[in-house]
Each structure stands twice: as C-alpha cells, then as structure tokens.
C-alpha cells in the first residue's frame, strides 16, 4: 500500500491544511508492454496467436533463399541482338513463379496453379461409368457388309447377269440405275425387286470385286460376254464331277480334228483359269476368218495359244484378240508373241 507523506505547518498557522502528495500513475501501452518485464505474454497476442506461433516456428526451420544471396547473377542488358533473344543469367523469372529454400530446392507457388471453377460444381459421386453402347446393326449395314464379303467368280457373274439388260454393258447399267435413282418412280411396287439405289450399290460392289480380281475391262463387257464367262465356269464345274476324264489331245498325232481345237478340254480350262477364277491371266479368243460374222472360239490362255502356234496347229494363222478389253482389234497369230503374256 503506498505511503502518504503528510507535512504540518507551523503552530501559528491556523489556516494550514494537510497537504497530501499522491504519486501520478504511469500510462503504459498494453501492446508495447506485452513483452516487457513482468508481462504474462512473451510477444504480441491476438486471436490468431496459435497460427502465428506455428509460422514463426516454421520460418525458423524453413529458410527461403533470397535472390540477393545467389552469387554471380547478371543484370538485364539488351533483350535481343540480331534476332536472337538474350536472357541474363539470374533467377528473376524463377523467383516470380516460385522460390528456393536454403538447400537450393525449387518450389512453385501454389497460387500460380490454374483451377477451373466449374469443377467445384461437379458432383463426382453421381457420375457413373457409361456402359458400352450395344450397336444395333441395321439392314442397310448388313447389306453393305455382305456386299464387301469376297465372293466367288461364279457368284459375281451371276449377280452381274441379274442386274444387266440384254446387250447392256456394266457401265451402261450404272448410268441407267444412277439416272433412275433420284426419280419418284424409282421404287418399283409389286415387282419384288429392290429400288434403284440398292441395285446401283449392289452392281457397283460386284464390279469393284471383279476389278480387284484383275478383270479391268469389266465395265465395258456386255451381258452376253459375261454369260459366256459364266458358261465356261459351269462347264469346268461339270467336268470336275465327271469320274471319266476325257481323252487328252495327242500332240504327236498326224492329224488333229478341228473340233478338238475349237472346244477346250477341262485341262485347258483349268490352265485358262487363274488360281481361283481365271480372271487374272490374259485370255484370248480367235476366229478362222477375218469377217464380222465369223464364229469366235475361246477364251484360251496365252500359254495354250503359244503351244498351238509352236506345234503348227495354225499353219496359215488365225485371227486373235485379247478378251480384255472387249471389242479390240483382231491380229494374225503369226504377228503375236504369246510368250510375252505368259
């Protein structure tokens, strides 16, 4: 308890009063005195004192390297010289995007990461993996897949004959079906036949497969010529089922019947056909007289024609032409070297 100092005047002073001197109180800043002697707190205290203490402890353990502490840095000079960019040797760009610790490890600033705000509105719990779609194959796709399936030569020829008119070429049939495809009357009702676009696609697919087999002149062939090809394939198939093979041509015989030369045997037909269908080899047809109404014989392979020419079966020569392309010019067999085509 503070002591009070009391002084008394003289006895004769009747008007004297007691003079009491009270020490003045010292105003102290509570914030400044927080760390002073006798204070309960060692430093500044606030509501975030716990976080501040953690930051102070972390800063003591994790030292950030200042750019001034790095030796050998250069100041920026010219931005470029002669079209070549000049970059000064310093850490200015790195310090803008991150920082180094005392050990030299580099850390990017987390604030620099770009985040799309719309991702926060997505409920990932409701998102489910989409099951695979079961593709339903339509009728048109099924027909397209069937059209691309490799077919035999006989099936191709039969399909072409079904779509062609008498004395009509494949190219002419394509023009006819293509012209009718856009008309209103293209769909034939009650006839049982598909409409013109479907027939056009089928004809185009069959012709493409014929070209892929090596028959490049199929677009100029008529229906009658394709029928002759199909007939030749049918004779070959019938001959393969015959258990009794026909007599082969005797090359050492003194005389050979003209009918044997005109009608190819199954062995000759097998040589005339390629590995599967006979559309890869160069085929020939010939006639004995160079007239428009002369009968044509064939088709025969180049090897068979060369054999007959070498053995003298055509002493006066015959008039030959290639089967592909159709409508070619006839030449005498004496002027043709069939070995060039074998």
UniProtKB/Swiss-Prot annotation:
InterPro entries: CD2BP2/Lin1, GYF, GYF-like_dom_sf. Keywords: Acetylation, Cytoplasm, Isopeptide bond, mRNA processing, mRNA splicing, Nucleus, Phosphoprotein, Ubl conjugation. The modification Phosphoserine is found at residues 46, 49, 117, 196. SMART domains: GYF (SM00444). There is a cross-link at residue 26 (Glycyl lysine isopeptide (Lys-Gly) (interchain with G-Cter in SUMO2)). The keyword Magnesium does not apply. The keyword Phosphoprotein applies. It is found in: Cytoplasm; Nucleus. GO terms for molecular function: ribonucleoprotein complex binding. The modification N6-acetyllysine is found at residue 44. GO terms for biological process: mRNA processing; RNA splicing. SUPFAM superfamilies: GYF domain. Residues 1-64, 130-150, 177-200 are annotated as: Disordered. One of its GO terms (cellular component) is U5 snRNP. Residues 281-339 form the GYF domain. PROSITE patterns: GYF (PS50829). Involved in pre-mRNA splicing as component of the U5 snRNP complex that is involved in spliceosome assembly. Component of the U5 snRNP complex composed of the U5 snRNA and at least PRPF6, PRPF8, SNRNP200, EFTUD2, SNRNP40, DDX23, TXNL4A and CD2BP2. Interacts directly with TXNL4A and PRPF6. Interacts (via GYF domain) with CD2 (via Pro-rich sequence in the cytoplasmic domain). Interacts with PQBP1. This is CD2 antigen cytoplasmic tail-binding protein 2.
């Amino acid at each position: 308890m503070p002591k009070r100092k009391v002084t008394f005047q003289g006895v004769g002073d009747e008007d004297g009063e007691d003079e009491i001197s009270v020490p003045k109180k010292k105003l102290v800043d509570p914030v400044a005195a927080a760390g002073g002697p006798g204070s309960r707190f060692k430093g500044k205290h606030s509501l975030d004192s716990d976080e501040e203490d953690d930051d102070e402890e972390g800063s003591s353990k994790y030292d950030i390297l200042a750019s001034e502490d790095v030796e050998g840095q250069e100041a920026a000079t010219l931005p470029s010289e002669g079209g070549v960019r000049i970059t000064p040797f310093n850490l200015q760009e790195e310090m803008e995007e991150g920082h180094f610790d005392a050990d030299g490890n580099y850390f990017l600033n987390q604030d620099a990461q770009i985040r799309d705000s719309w991702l926060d509105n997505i409920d990932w719990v409701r998102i489910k993996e989409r099951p695979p779609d079961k593709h339903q194959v339509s009728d048109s796709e099924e027909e397209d897949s069937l059209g691309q399936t490799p077919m035999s030569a006989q099936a191709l020829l039969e399909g072409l004959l079904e779509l062609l008119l008498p004395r009509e070429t494949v190219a002419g049939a394509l023009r006819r079906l293509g012209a009718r495809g856009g008309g209103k009357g293209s769909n034939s009702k009650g006839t049982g036949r598909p409409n013109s676009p479907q027939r056009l696609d089928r004809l185009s697919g069959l012709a493409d497969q014929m070209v892929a087999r090596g028959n490049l002149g199929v677009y100029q062939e008529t229906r009658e010529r394709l029928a002759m090809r199909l007939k030749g394939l049918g004779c070959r198939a019938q001959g393969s089922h015959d258990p009794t093979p026909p007599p082969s041509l005797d090359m050492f015989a003194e005389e050979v019947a003209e009918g044997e030369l005109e009608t190819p045997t199954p062995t000759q037909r097998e040589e005339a056909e390629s590995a599967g269908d006979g559309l890869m080899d160069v085929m020939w047809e010939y006639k004995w007289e160079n007239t428009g109404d002369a009968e044509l014989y064939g088709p025969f392979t180049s090897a068979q024609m060369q054999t007959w020419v070498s053995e003298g079966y055509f002493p006066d020569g015959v008039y030959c032409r290639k089967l592909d392309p159709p409508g070619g010019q006839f030449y005498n067999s004496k002027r043709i070297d069939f070995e060039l085509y074998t």
